[in-house]
């Protein structure tokens, strides 16, 4: 039953999160950019927090498909993938003032930093996180959860590109042409190159501290 319920939770989050994202242009006209961002964040968190609680409570449910936690090297690989996932995820934290609506939320179309590697870093981050935790936990519940999360983020790639194209019909096609969904593909094609100084930002220190803290808490 928990396998079905986690998919229901994920579907509910998808409807709230992606649904409100799709309604952003109309919502901002009525509530303003800050007001709608607060509504968006509050509604998303209202579903995400109990979803995470349900996941942690049931992550070992179902059939134990494999048990590799005691295999030498597995722990290091799992933590390596987890740390890498945060490096892809954290561009969303560059503008915390906007996320919390302290500053006026704005749209940022750019092809620097992690965007040179992948246009949708959050999808890559979630996929890496799912792979790492599926390897570590090894339960049928974790497999179902990971497949659901990855499927939602793949939908998010399509949905996000569609929204950007509709909102920025002139600027987005150029960004899309010069970046890639598959990590490093635009670099392989010669459309992008890594500029390491773009990664030298104070926020990365915060990510490193966060990863280390989570490691010790685990």
Give residue spans per PLM region.
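A generic, lipid-embedded transmembrane alpha helix
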Residues: 39-59
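Membrane-interface helix-loop junction between the first two transmembrane segments
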Residues: 18-36
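Alpha-helical transmembrane segments
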Residues: 2-6, 70-88, 141-153
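Membrane-interface helix termini and inter-helical loops of multi-pass transporters
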Residues: 24-27, 57-71, 101-103
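Hydrophobic, well-structured mid-protein blocks that either form specific transmembrane helices
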Residues: 84-134
């Amino acid at each position: 039953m928990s396998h079905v319920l986690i998919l229901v939770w994920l579907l509910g989050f998808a409807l709230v999160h992606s649904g409100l994202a799709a309604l952003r242009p109309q919502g901002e006209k009525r509530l303003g950019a800050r007001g709608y961002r607060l509504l968006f964040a509050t509604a998303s968190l209202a579903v995400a927090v109990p979803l995470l609680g349900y996941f942690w409570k049931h992550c070992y449910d179902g059939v134990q498909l494999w048990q590799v936690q005691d295999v030498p090297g597995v722990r290091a690989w799992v933590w390596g993938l987890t740390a890498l996932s945060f490096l892809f995820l954290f561009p969303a934290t560059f503008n915390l003032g906007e996320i919390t609506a302290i500053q006026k939320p704005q749209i940022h179309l750019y092809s620097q930093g992690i965007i040179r590697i992948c246009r949708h870093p959050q999808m890559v981050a979630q996929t890496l996180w799912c792979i790492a935790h599926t390897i570590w936990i090894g339960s049928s519940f974790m497999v179902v959860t990971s497949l659901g999360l990855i499927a939602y983020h793949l939908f998010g790639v399509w949905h996000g590109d569609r929204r950007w194209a509709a909102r920025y019909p002139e600027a987005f096609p150029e960004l899309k042409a010069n970046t890639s969904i598959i990590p490093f593909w635009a670099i392989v094609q010669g459309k992008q190159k890594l500029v390491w100084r773009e990664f030298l930002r104070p926020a990365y220190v915060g990510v490193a501290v966060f990863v280390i803290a989570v490691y010790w808490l685990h």
